[in-house]
Amino acid sequence: MNIFRLAGDMTHLASVLVLLLKIHTIKSCAGVSLKTQELYAIVFATRYLDIFTSFVSLYNTSMKLVFLGSSFSIVWYMKYHKAVHRTYDREQDTFRHWFLVLPCFLLALLIHEKFTFLEVLWTSSLYLEAVAILPQLVLLQRTRNIDNLTGQYIFLLGGYRGLYILNWIYRYFTEPHFVHWITWIAGFVQTLLYADFFYYYFLSWKNNKKLQLPA
């Protein structure tokens, strides 16, 4: 494992911890899209089915369990914890996220590396993760005002994807035959979706102002 992969994993983990801190400690999910969190739960559930069939390392298995457990716990908190659920902005979080799931699965049936059950589900998780942030970004544009923890959560999510791209570049030049076009394209699309948010995030940091997105 290279430093970019490790940094990407730790940044991804940090994003989850920031969100859990907000939900568990402050008892608030204001500004957080339940639709995006449900999509992430599907992403990890379909991607990590191989946890029952293959073992790579203790680190690998531990990270899979952490992301599976955290994604479903976040969804549970937002839907069923009374104090947290009261802060959920249902009226603004109206993106029809389920319409993203089937197209991603159908695309995985058509474009994949190997036509096996686990491989198709794994590929569909790549496509779905690339667009899972869309409901969250739409919600932020509607509400405009973004609290610090929500902003940090999304910034860390985008940072994790950026570090993974550096990981792929590093492995391309250091490992023979390391070519995974599906993973690369999905990751690049996902990173592009964060570009607008990053622009306004750095502007707010530079000017020492509260983060706001244009309507």
UniProtKB/Swiss-Prot annotation:
> Keyword set for this entry?
Endoplasmic reticulum, ER-Golgi transport, Golgi apparatus, Membrane, Protein transport, Receptor, Transmembrane, Transmembrane helix, Transport
Q: Which GO terms describe its biological process?
A: protein retention in ER lumen; protein transport; vesicle-mediated transport
Kindly indicate whether the keyword Disulfide bond belongs to this entry.
no
Topology relative to the membrane: Multi-pass membrane protein
Give me the Gene Ontology terms describing cellular component. Answer: endoplasmic reticulum membrane; Golgi apparatus; Golgi membrane
Q: Does the keyword Oxidoreductase apply?
A: no
The UniProt family comment states: Belongs to the ERD2 family.
What is the protein name for this chain? ER lumen protein-retaining receptor B
Q: Please list the GO terms describing molecular function.
A: ER retention sequence binding
Ranges annotated as spanning the membrane: 6-26, 55-77, 98-118, 120-140, 149-169, 178-198
Q: What organism is listed for this UniProt entry?
A: Arabidopsis thaliana (Mouse-ear cress)
Q: Which Pfam families match?
A: ER_lumen_recept
Kindly list the places in or outside the cell where this protein is found, as annotated in its UniProt entry.
Answer: Golgi apparatus membrane; Endoplasmic reticulum membrane
Q: Which PANTHER family does its entry note?
A: ER LUMEN PROTEIN RETAINING RECEPTOR
Q: Which InterPro entries match?
A: ER_ret_rcpt
